[in-house]
Amino acid sequence: MEILTDVTIPKRKDETHKGDYGRILLIGGNANLGGAIIMAARACVYSGSGLITVATHPTNHAALHSRCPEAMVVDINDTKMLTKLIETSDSILIGPGLGLDFKGNNAMTFLLQNIQPHQNLIIDGDAITIMSKLKVEVPKCQNVVFTPHQMEWERLSGIPIEEQTYERNREAVDQIHSAVVLKQHGTEIYLKDNTYKLEIGTPAMATGGMGDTLSGIITSFIGQFDDFDYAVKTATYVHSYIGEHLS
């Protein structure tokens, strides 16, 4: 396992437009947990995403327009619109504030049925728990990354927290053919051919919404960078770097 000590964000080319920096779809935010998807959307915006659409519960629409005017907003229950958005997105994040009731299950199932092989999928929060409970296979799309904390990883992998060693985690990651950002003290980033560990970060980051922000940055960088692995590790490092310096 390599200690990640530095990253470089690629400079943008002059002759580009917003369509070159990701067509992002965020799915989440039920009637009680709208703040999670708003924070994820704001993280996407401030990380440089080109086009962002948020599918969320109607009670969150006014707050999203106010707090994140750069993002487009649709009703998560509008399956016709959601189908179109899934088809036209490059990268899709599902999970922040999604909820664990039947509506959350339905949204997760609907996405898994409609996602395309060329797309990137980021699975966070409640969506990880739903996948664990439903025991569904990881979709065969271009790239998949899970962003669990240790309890969510226990649900997904079956490995108790106290037994989450590098060796056991690596074996579980290889079985699901996905990248995993395991959030903890000394966050670990499991990619296809490499594993990284962070030594930056702070206990001040142990607060609500921190994971939603991380998933938003990861989604944003995946939409902008050509190299998936580099996007994931860079986003994770930047998130911890900012948290440490702001504290």
Predicted regions and their residues:
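Small-residue (G/A/S/T)-rich helix-start motifs and N-terminal tracts that mark the onset
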Residues: 1-120, 129-145, 154-247
